[in-house]
Every structure is written in structure tokens, then in C-alpha cells.
């Protein structure tokens, strides 16, 4: 068998398997985030601990609570048109509820459950939510304050705050006060329609001394029940360096100086604190007892002015609050490239007003950009197809002499200007594009509950009738049928014929938006191949005509 063709096969198979690996890894090896009903039974304030600015090995002692904490009660409620925020008696954000319709769709069923329901005569009895809670009931709450002094800390956790108002709306000021005898804590909060807020922490004491303390942005949201993306703590410092601590990876206390924002995230939502001070703040990452999930704290020694946000990781909303907050949207190793892809996709959405059509336009743009390379690759494959008979003759002639066969093959390629790997280059370049689009479409909360046409009512979940995956497989097979076949080994041909089936199987549970991209990509590739085949055929005829003349 021709060594170059063999290498060609291996390269293409490696690329194909790279795509399939995404599906396999996500489906079989990553665990979804636990739901709010699956959270631990331990009380957060009794079990979570943080480090102090000065302590190093006394984590289990610093900022801990040794006394029993009474069940916190509701202190204040801030109501918005599409959300509601509750403040508890310990001066923390108890819960954030989203009321926007796009976030209230029922949980997506698993593949087998969905198929079973699809062929069942029973109607879907799963009701939509009335409101979506973002925070776990028994996890670390945003705006919780802890002191280094254990006596003061325990007193703080057993002394309720008083509030200036019990009900208020956006842009109204809420003052929370806690009287600890010789020390009073005053939290001044202003919440806005976009769910970001301003926070001022002040103290009153006879000697004007401020004890060392920390404040937290809280445990990550748990609203996304089927997360196969990054979840944990993400922060950025003044050098624009981003640090990530994933769930189950918080094994020791970590300190990060000059931090600009501290965020805890799941697939679609975040709770964060940030500063406008160019010097930043010191962030401390602790580990939740039992799970080793990261818990974020800000270490403070003085009064503080901070800002926060709890809500969807919507690109435009975060950018409007502060451009640096768009870095909260995490795309993995190719974030720098994926973010550019999303910006282009978002621009196209603003132009057409539909995410499905925006994805199709994005695919067209990608194909146009890659066309010159695709053309060269297809020309090279066509030349290899024409050389197939001569290649077979050489294989028969130099059977058992691989070195001579290789040398004569290279001479043949050079003589006719053919490149055995030329057809793979466009496919190789599509790898980062595919991964970027995969990460964008899987992470973009903007696509949640976004309709396209007919049966596609949500581009963020799998096609309910599997029509797009089947079309994708058919279009991939169609593309194979119009692409020049340069393989001389029957086994190679059989393996390639299986690729459409494998892609269909492993992409069947992927978000409809991603499958729409791949289907459109295949159809455009077919059209492009037909055009190039026609161009090459015309050139071949013209060349033959010139020889006759």
C-alpha cells in the first residue's frame, strides 16, 4: 500500500476522531453539576472556612463558626421586572430568581428518556418553571462576612442585621446594619435592572479600629442542571491573567494578589465581585469540605467599595457593566479565538435577528475564508485520483521494495505537481474553527430558548426529532460521494464510508445550533466541490482540445 496514502488516511482519521472525541468526552466522562435538590445537607456557615490575610496554616480555625447558627430569615426583597433578589437576616444574598421566559423552560431530558417519550402516546406533563432560583439553598451565600477574631466571628453569625427597607426596587439604596456591641458593620447596597450592584462596607467603633475580615461572592450558581462545561472559580488580575480553579480541584488554599474580579460560574450563570480600583484586591480560594469545590473570598483590612453581579453570562450585559467581565465567559484553551467567533456571531445576530440564521451566515463566512485553501486541496485530490492507475502500477512493480516504491512515488507526485497531503490542509484548519464554534454554541446563554425554524425551538439543546443530525450524516455522505477518492486500498474506503454514521451517532445529542453549523458546512462543501469539479473538468477538456490542435 502507498505509504503517502496511508499517512493521508491516518491524518484524516485523526482529525475525524478529534471531532468525535468531543462528543465522547462530554457524554461519557464529564459529570453534570448537581442540582439545587442534590446539594449537601451540611450548613455552609458551619463548615466552610477561609484563610485570613495573616494566617497560613490555621484555615480550620480562622473565620470558622463554632456555635449553632439560627436559621436565617428573609430581611429584604428587591423586585425587578424580570428578576427578584432576597436578602437574609445575616446580610447575605439569600436567593436570586430569574423570571424571564427564556430561562424557565423545563430541563432537557436525557437521550434515552427523550426517545422513550418521543414514541410514547403520553403528553409532556413537565411544566415550565414560574421562576428560576440561581443559588443553592445550603451553600455559601454572596456577601457573607467573616472575621479573623473567632469570638467576634461567632457573635456576627448569631446577630441579625437590620434593614432600612424590607421591599424596594431597582436603583434604590438598601442599608444593612449589624450591631456587635463595640463594633457596627454597615453594608450599603444599590441594585440595578441589569442585576449588578454597588456595595460599600463601613464600620463604626469607639477606637476606629477595623478588624481583619473577608467577604465572599458565594458558591457558584446551580441553575444549569446539565453542565458539561467549566464550573468553579475564575478570576482575573491587573495583568489580564486569568486563573481558573475547577470543581473538585481546590485542594489547598491559594492567594491571588491584584485581582480585578472574582467569579464563581456554572455553564450559563455567575456570581461575582469586582473592583474599579486599578490596584485590585487580594483573593483567597478555599476548598469546600467534602467536595473540594472552590470557594472564593476577598481579604480586606479596611472599609471597601466593591461591585457585584449575579445572573446570566450574557456577553452584551457583562460588557455594558464592565468590559473586563466578558472574560467570565470561559471557552477553554482557545478562548482568545472563540471570543472572536462569538463577537462575529453576535454581530450577525444583530443583523438578521435570529441565532439560527446567524449560525448559517457564520458558516458561509468561514467557508469563503477557507475557499482558497479548499480549492488547492481539492485540485490536489483530483490530481491524485488521476494518478491512481500509475500509482497502482508502481505498487505492483516495486512490491516488496518499499524504499524504491517511495522514491518513485515522490518522483511521480513531483512530476505532476500533486501533494498527497494537500487535501487534508483545509480539514486541519477547520479543527480550531470547529472547536471554537463548539465552545461558543455550547456556552452561549444567548442561544438558550432561541428558536430557528419549524421544529427547532431551542438551539441550545439537541434536536427533538433528530432531523438535523440525520441531515448532517446524509450531507456528509453526499460530500464523500462528490469528492475525488484517492484511496487504492478497499479497507480505507470502508472506513471512510463509516464516518458519516459515526458522526451522526455521536453528534445526535449535541445542541441543535452546533449540528446546524456542521450540516450547513457539509452542504456548502458539497456545492463548493461540485463547482470545483466543474471547473477542473472544463480545464481538462480545454487542455485536451489544445493537445488535439
Curated annotation (Swiss-Prot):
Gene that encodes it: yidC
Gene Ontology molecular functions: membrane insertase activity
Pfam annotation, one family: 60KD_IMP
Subunit text: Interacts with the Sec translocase complex via SecD. Specifically interacts with transmembrane segments of nascent integral membrane proteins during membrane integration.
Topology with respect to the bilayer: Multi-pass membrane protein
GO biological process, one term: protein transport
Listed InterPro entries: Membr_insert_YidC (IPR019998), Membr_insert_YidC_N (IPR028053), YidC/ALB3/OXA1/COX18 (IPR001708), YidC/Oxa/ALB_C (IPR028055), YidC_ALB_C (IPR047196), YidC_periplasmic_sf (IPR038221)
Name of the protein: Membrane protein insertase YidC
TM ranges: 9-29, 328-348, 351-371, 417-437, 452-472, 498-518
Amino acid at each position: 500500500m502507498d505509504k503517502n496514502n496511508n499517512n493521508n488516511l491516518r491524518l484524516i482519521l485523526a482529525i475525524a476522531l478529534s471531532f468525535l472525541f468531543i462528543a465522547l468526552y462530554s457524554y461519557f466522562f464529564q459529570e453534570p453539576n448537581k442540582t439545587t435538590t442534590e446539594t449537601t445537607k451540611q450548613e455552609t456557615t458551619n463548615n466552610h472556612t477561609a484563610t485570613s490575610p495573616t494566617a497560613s496554616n490555621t484555615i480550620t480555625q480562622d473565620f470558622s463558626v463554632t456555635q449553632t447558627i439560627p436559621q436565617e430569615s428573609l430581611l429584604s426583597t428587591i423586585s425587578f421586572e424580570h428578576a427578584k433578589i432576597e436578602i437574609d437576616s445575616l446580610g447575605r444574598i439569600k436567593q436570586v430568581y430569574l423570571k424571564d421566559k427564556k430561562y424557565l423552560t423545563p430541563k432537557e431530558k436525557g437521550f434515552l428518556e427523550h426517545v422513550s417519550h418521543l414514541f410514547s402516546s403520553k403528553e409532556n406533563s413537565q411544566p415550565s418553571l414560574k421562576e428560576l432560583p440561581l443559588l443553592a439553598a445550603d451553600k455559601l451565600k454572596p456577601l457573607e462576612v467573616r472575621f479573623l477574631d473567632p469570638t467576634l466571628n461567632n457573635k456576627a453569625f448569631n446577630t441579625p442585621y437590620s434593614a432600612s427597607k424590607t421591599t424596594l426596587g431597582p436603583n434604590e439604596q438598601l442599608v444593612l446594619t449589624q450591631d456587635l456591641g463595640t463594633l457596627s458593620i454597615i453594608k450599603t447596597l444599590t441594585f440595578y435592572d441589569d442585576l449588578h450592584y454597588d456595595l460599600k462596607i463601613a464600620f463604626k467603633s469607639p477606637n476606629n479600629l477595623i478588624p481583619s475580615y473577608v467577604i465572599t461572592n458565594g458558591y457558584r450558581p446551580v441553575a444549569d442542571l446539565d453542565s458539561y462545561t467549566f464550573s468553579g472559580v475564575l478570576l482575573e488580575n491587573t495583568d489580564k491573567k486569568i486563573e481558573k480553579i475547577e470543581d473538585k480541584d481546590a485542594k489547598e488554599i491559594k492567594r491571588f494578589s491584584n485581582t480585578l474580579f472574582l467569579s464563581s460560574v456554572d455553564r450559563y450563570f455567575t456570581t461575582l465581585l469586582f473592583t474599579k480600583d486599578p490596584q485590585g484586591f487580594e483573593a483567597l480560594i478555599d476548598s469546600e469540605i467534602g467536595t473540594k469545590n472552590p470557594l472564593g473570598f476577598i481579604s480586606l483590612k479596611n472599609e471597601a467599595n466593591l461591585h457585584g453581579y449575579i445572573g446570566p453570562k450574557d456577553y452584551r450585559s457583562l460588557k455594558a457593566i464592565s468590559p473586563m467581565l466578558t472574560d467570565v465567559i470561559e471557552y477553554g484553551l482557545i478562548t482568545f479565538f472563540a471570543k472572536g467567533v462569538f463577537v462575529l456571531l453576535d454581530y450577525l445576530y444583530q443583523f438578521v435577528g435570529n441565532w439560527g440564521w446567524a449560525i448559517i451566515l457564520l458558516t458561509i463566512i468561514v467557508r469563503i475564508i477557507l475557499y482558497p485553501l479548499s480549492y488547492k486541496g481539492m485540485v490536489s485530490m483530483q490530481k491524485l485520483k488521476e494518478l491512481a492507475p500509475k500509482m497502482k502500477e508502481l505498487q505492483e512493480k516495486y512490491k516488496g521494495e518499499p524504499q524504491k516504491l517511495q522514491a518513485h512515488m515522490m518522483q511521480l507526485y513531483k512530476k505532476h505537481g500533486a501533494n498527497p497531503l494537500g487535501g487534508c490542509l483545509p480539514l486541519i484548519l477547520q479543527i480550531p474553527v470547529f472547536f471554537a464554534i463548539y465552545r461558543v454554541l455550547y456556552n452561549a446563554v444567548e442561544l438558550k430558548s432561541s428558536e430557528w425554524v419549524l421544529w427547532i425551538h431551542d438551539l441550545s439543546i439537541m434536536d427533538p426529532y433528530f432531523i438535523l443530525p440525520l441531515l448532517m450524516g446524509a450531507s456528509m455522505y453526499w460530500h464523500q460521494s462528490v469528492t475525488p477518492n484517492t484511496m487504492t486500498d478497499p479497507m480505507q474506503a470502508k472506513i471512510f464510508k463509516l464516518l458519516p454514521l459515526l458522526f451522526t451517532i455521536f453528534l445526535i445529542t449535541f445542541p441543535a445550533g452546533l449540528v446546524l453549523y456542521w450540516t450547513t458546512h457539509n452542504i456548502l462543501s458539497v456545492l463548493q466541490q461540485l463547482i470545483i469539479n466543474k471547473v477542473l473538468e472544463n480545464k481538462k477538456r480545454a487542455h485536451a482540445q489544445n493537445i488535439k490542435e
